[in-house]
Amino acid sequence: ASRTVPRLEMDMNRMFPGDASGDMMERITAAVVDSIIGSDICMDLHASDIFVREIPQVRLSEDFAEALLPYAKMTNADMIWMNATATVHESTLAHSLNLLGVPTLVLEMGQGHDIHRSFGNQIVDGIFHIMSEMDIWEGPESVLQEPAVSSDGEVEFIRSAVDGVFLPLIEHNHYVKKGDL
């Protein structure tokens, strides 16, 4: 799946909140927003791109972090990244819905537009927990993990400096400090 509009090569997640009187794409994004208004919560799920492998994480804009952090901690994600990247900034679905009063979390995970089943199951456990807290779900719940919470400057992507095959010296989802490798 892709959020890029075929043939137009336009990123739909940079067109929100849309305009009901605008062009075709503005009308579509406005209709999406309109269909979600009034919801108790929204979770915007993203699989990472083909060059990045990411642990399950919630990305929050600093503008809404105080209100969203309690929900984010219930998602069962490995990490909460505050003020992280463009996925939570203006013209995105999450930013627009948060401005309009719908608490919206961006969950990012996986690699190559693929969400591994274990990551999906982990987040589904969190979704059931949130539903239970909101009195929507009465079934059994899994024990949730405590996520690491980070603000800008505390998260680094590890990437190869040159073209070729990149073989990391550490496993995914480990803390690394200067001098460790």
Enumerate the language-model features and the residues they cover.
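Structured catalytic-domain cores with a bias toward divalent-metal coordination
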Residues: A1-L181
